[in-house]
């Protein structure tokens, strides 16, 4: 029987966007393994999630042109990011507030037609990487780098973040990470976005709701804590003793186990492969080697295997992404899935309004205040 507490295993909606079954993840009918084996680009996957079919060459070209046309953010938005970057705010709070501001500055934000919603979706998808890269550089005292319309989604983000053109391997790694995190059925942030969409609120409010939900440590932030752990282990010096100490203290080891997958997370192996390829023969190899030792120890001690968060920490670090903004990268990818669910909810909408089971006291009588 499904659990009421946390709604585990309860079915809340029908969807054609993604499915998790028999420990496999599929996007609109395409197994994630098939997309990975064929090196599907993130733009293709965004199109797939929003349209429920893979694009033709012409459709993909037109879709990419729309995205690239909308990469840039206004001076007003950049100024708002600058102000926030000086306040030592949580990175997810900055993203949440800036996405909300995108809605404020879009004079057509309140339009609800299919065409208007699609245009708003394109703008959100295209501008969020620029917002993140701008924030990441400003908080380090660096000047923002303008996006390049001749670069694809993954390459453009890494260029804006690091100030140099990424290698083909780096582009592949970024694309893979984005595709693997793009969508994951009815997780907490996606459900929150659908609840908001069911009220017929605007898409900026729906995405802001999702970002606020992802900010919570029980949903987002796991790979950030994985890399913090790897740093601690490097200083500690011994993987086995470190893990045993944590386990004895009943502390959770981040990057292991999953709420839905009972055996292996089907996304994990692709990020493990990318972590190995990116670090091979470089100064970053220590992070991959530490990760492998942790993986082996956790298998021996707890019979647990890594999830998607574990090796993504090393991948992101090698790509020049600071661990404090790892969850922003999660959001940059997952916004594609959020938008797909928002659009699906609005096409066949019914207000999401569940009931609660009251467990408090009953039949109490009012007592005047002077007698209490």
UniProtKB/Swiss-Prot annotation:
Keywords: Transferase, Tricarboxylic acid cycle. It catalyses: oxaloacetate + acetyl-CoA + H2O = citrate + CoA + H(+). CDD domains: BSuCS-II_like. GO terms for molecular function: citrate (Si)-synthase activity. The keyword Mitochondrion does not apply. It is an enzyme of class 2 (transferase). The active site is at 258, 309. SUPFAM superfamilies: Citrate synthase. GO terms for biological process: carbohydrate metabolic process; tricarboxylic acid cycle. PROSITE patterns: CITRATE_SYNTHASE (PS00480). Disulfide bonds: none annotated. GO terms for cellular component: cytosol. Gene3D superfamilies: Citrate Synthase, domain 1 (1.10.580.10), Cytochrome P450-Terp, domain 2 (1.10.230.10). Citrate synthase is found in nearly all cells capable of oxidative metabolism. Belongs to the citrate synthase family. This is Citrate synthase. It comes from Streptococcus mutans serotype c (strain ATCC 700610 / UA159). The lineage of its organism: Bacteria, Bacillati, Bacillota, Bacilli, Lactobacillales. The gene is citZ.
């Amino acid at each position: 029987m499904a659990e009421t507490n946390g709604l585990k295993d309860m079915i809340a909606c029908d969807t054609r966007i993604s499915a998790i079954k028999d420990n496999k993840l599929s996007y609109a009918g395409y197994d994630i393994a098939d997309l990975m084996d064929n090196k599907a680009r993130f733009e293709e996957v965004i199109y797939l999630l929003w349209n429920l079919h893979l694009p033709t060459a012409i459709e993909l070209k037109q879709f990419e042109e729309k995205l690239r046309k909308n990469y840039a953010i206004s001076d007003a938005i950049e100024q708002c990011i600058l102000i926030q970057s000086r306040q030592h705010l949580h990175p997810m709070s900055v993203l949440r507030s800036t996405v909300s501001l995108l809605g404020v500055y879009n004079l057509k934000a309140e339009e609800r037609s299919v065409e208007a919603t699609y245009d708003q979706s394109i703008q959100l998808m295209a501008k969020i990487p620029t917002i993140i890269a701008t924030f990441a550089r400003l908080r380090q005292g660096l000047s923002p780098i303008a996006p390049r319309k001749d670069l694809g989604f993954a390459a453009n983000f890494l260029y804006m973040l690091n100030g140099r053109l990424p290698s083909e391997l780096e582009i592949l790694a970024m694309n893979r990470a984005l595709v693997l995190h793009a969508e994951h059925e009815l997780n907490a942030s996606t459900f929150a976005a659908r609840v908001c969409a069911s009220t017929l609120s605007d898409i900026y409010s729906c995405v802001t709701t999702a970002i606020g939900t992802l900010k919570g440590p029980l949903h987002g932030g796991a790979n950030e804590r994985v890399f913090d752990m790897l740093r601690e282990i490097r200083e500690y010096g011994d993987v086995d003793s470190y893990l045993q100490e944590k386990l004895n203290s009943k502390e959770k080891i981040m990057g292991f186990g999953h709420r839905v997958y009972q055996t292996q997370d089907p996304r994990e192996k692709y990020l493990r492969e990318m972590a190995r390829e990116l670090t091979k023969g470089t100064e970053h190899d220590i992070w991959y080697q530490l990760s492998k030792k942790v993986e082996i120890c956790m298998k021996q001690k707890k019979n647990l295997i890594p999830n998607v968060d574990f090796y993504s920490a090393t991948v992101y670090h090698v790509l020049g992404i600071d661990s404090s903004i790892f969850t922003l990268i999660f959001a940059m990818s997952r916004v594609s899935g959020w938008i797909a669910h928002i659009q699906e909810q609005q096409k066949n909408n019914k207000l999401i309004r569940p009931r609660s089971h009251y467990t408090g006291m009953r039949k109490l009588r009012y007592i005047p205040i002077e007698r209490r």
